[in-house]
Every structure is written in C-alpha cells, then in structure tokens.
Amino acid sequence: MKKLVKFFLIISFSLVAWTSHACDFLDVPIGTSMTKLNDRYEGLVELDEEETDDTVYKYIYRAKDLCKDEELRNSYLLVFVQNLKLIGMRIEVLHEDLDKKDVYEFTKSNIGTLDDRAEKKNWFGTIQLDSLGNRYILFSKRKTFDSKLFETLLITESDYIELIYSPDVEEAM
C-alpha cells in the first residue's frame, strides 16, 4: 500500500512540475543586452551591433515561440529595445469572447496576485502589480469598441515607462 501511495505522489508531483512553469523570457532582467538574448533564445531578430541610437524599437513575436505556457498560445509578445538593450516587454491578446482571461490567469499564476476587482467580468482598467526590485508591472483589461476583450501585461522599469508608451516608438520589421 505504501508503495502505491508513493507511486501516485511521485506521478502527481512530476505532472505538476511539468505543467506549471512561467515563461522564462519574462524573467530576463530589464537592461539585458539583446546580443546575450539572441544567444539564449531562438527566433529573436539579430540586431546590428553598430546601430545604437536612442530610438525605441518594438519587435513583435508570437508568445508561443518564446513561452511554452498554454495561456499565452494566442498572444503576442512585444519586445522593446533601446541602444541594443531590453527595456520592456508586453504580452497582448485580443479575444472575441469577453469571458476569456488568458493573460489574467497567466499573470495570477506566474507573476503575482491581482486586485479582486480584476477577476470580475465587467471590470475594465489597469492595475499595477507589486513586484520585487525595480520591475514595473501593469496588467490591463479593456473592452474594444466592437465588444472584444484586449488583455495586456507590461513588464519594464519605471525609468522606461514613458519611452514604451511614446508615440515615437518604431515598429521594427
């Protein structure tokens, strides 16, 4: 009987460890050199190391290419770069169904606790999450004019928030 219990415990813990993991790309420290990230993550655009200026560039990836989390399978990951350094990242998803909450579920289980009001179907807005260190984390949920749900999760540092939301951000191809 003890062997049977041990067997089920081992199987249970193995499956939990296998299925619950955070997107490790989101753990990359803000300010990390993009050349280091290119060595670590397949699929990132190779940046020209001689192209250093103060322009903020936005690169758009399918989140599932850099994150294996099930909640992010239909999301996009926007990577913000200035002077060849990572200054922020944002997960975005547009749902046809107002009841979906993939980014909310991902955030709640992998990033931090959200305000209780964010769980409500009819709540729309932005919440700043408590974070360790210099990280500035925002979760946002909005209803579009055509009744779709737009969820975002921004991870950056407070020094870069204005740069990321600046109209001068250039979308890189």
Question: Where are the language model's segments positioned?
Answer:
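Repetitive helical segments and hydrophobic/amphipathic motifs
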Residues: 12-15
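N-terminal signal peptide c-region/cleavage motif recognized by signal peptidases
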Residues: 17-19
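Alpha-helical scaffolding within the catalytic cores
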Residues: 70-74
